[in-house]
Amino acid sequence: MGFFLTLNYAVANTDMGTAPAATDPLGGRVLTGHPEEQIDYATRSTNLMTVRSKQIIKAFYGERPNKSYFFGCSTGGGQGIHEALQFPGDYDGIVARAPGMNGTHNTAANVWDYQAFNGPANVTAAQATAITTAVVKQCVGKDGGLSSDNFLTDPRDCHWDPAALQCTGAAADAATCLTAPQVAAMRKFYEGPINPRTGERIHAGRTRGSESYNGYPAALASLATTDGNSNYWVFGNDFDWLTFDFDHDMDTIDDALAARLNANTADLEEFKSRGGKLLLFHGLADPMVPTLNTIDYYERLITSQTHDGRHDDGKRKEGLRRTQEFARLFLQPGVAHCNGGAGPDATDFLSPLVQWVEQGIAPDQILASKIANGVTTFTRPLCSYPALPRYSGVGDPTEATSFACVDDFDRDDNQSPARKYLDDGDNYPIVPIDDRDHGHDHDNR
């Protein structure tokens, strides 16, 4: 918030109704048994913050603000998508980074990993580092990046198998090799949650190259007791994540919470018709919120913009053009969850949005930098999806100007969930708040 204050914006923030959670050992489980607070968490708090902030701005400055922008990452990124869907007049522009917009299924993906890495299958931090090193060694430089990179530009083109690190009995690799249960767990990590009865995909898996971020997946054992909050809301605070059934229990969770927590609907027509602009960003080495979920959402936006739902080459180009008129996705090679990772994670996210909203100039490329000890070590362009940066073969490889945004990569399936897991259900009834006639008024700067 402080940074935006230095730019002379009026800034507001919300804890989404979870104030005790920051200090309570139960974390988000403090909302168990409190459905109204769960609605606050899902959507209402952000809209209420927006409306009340505009009232305060008018009272202080004597006039309503003329433009407003939303900025959020992870859960905050998901809130941005909820705003565009449910309250499309709240903001002129939205930056949604690593958006956790599919609440029930992102939690299911976490529980999937908790179960996979439980007990003897748990992977240590040293093993996770060895996995990422092996992944990069096999796949780097084949996807537009440099052969000297220590991250992947497009992990979707990488098919490294964790069996390559399976223990052979040699003493030299004892600390970093993988046992058979660990190999199986890593395969599930990349696969993502599947309904065991129907074989339907519930949610995307994790990308290769994301394994060693922030102690993940080694930290899963401790996270398991504090995360998965929405499961506790339905099954109670004694919920045992080891017993979660990805068929029946998943349906129970979705029946109870999907309409509140999930923003899967790829229909942003009202936001678009109001002139709203959406910038999506997601790190391609994010192990917390699967990048492939955001890619799938954007692909469904493209399909929705063909108007007849067709996805052949001609219609896809038409849908992409229409989508890029109001929404653009920028994938961040080597960037982990919101920031961090080996890739260039320092980016001015807001200025391109402001320029798009206020001057009508849509961003095709955005500069990203890697900064170490206050020094920029290299830069790369972030490219408007579906393009990714490719080294031109000439020029300083540490400079973004030596890369072009190119879309000629062959890519595999983006792990699209089954249709039933993209249904948000009926809109959850949002309790009205007063002074809803705020139309296009926006947060000041």
Model-identified regions with their sequence ranges:
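C-terminal His-loop and adjacent cap/lid subdomain of alpha/beta-hydrolase
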Residues: M1-R445
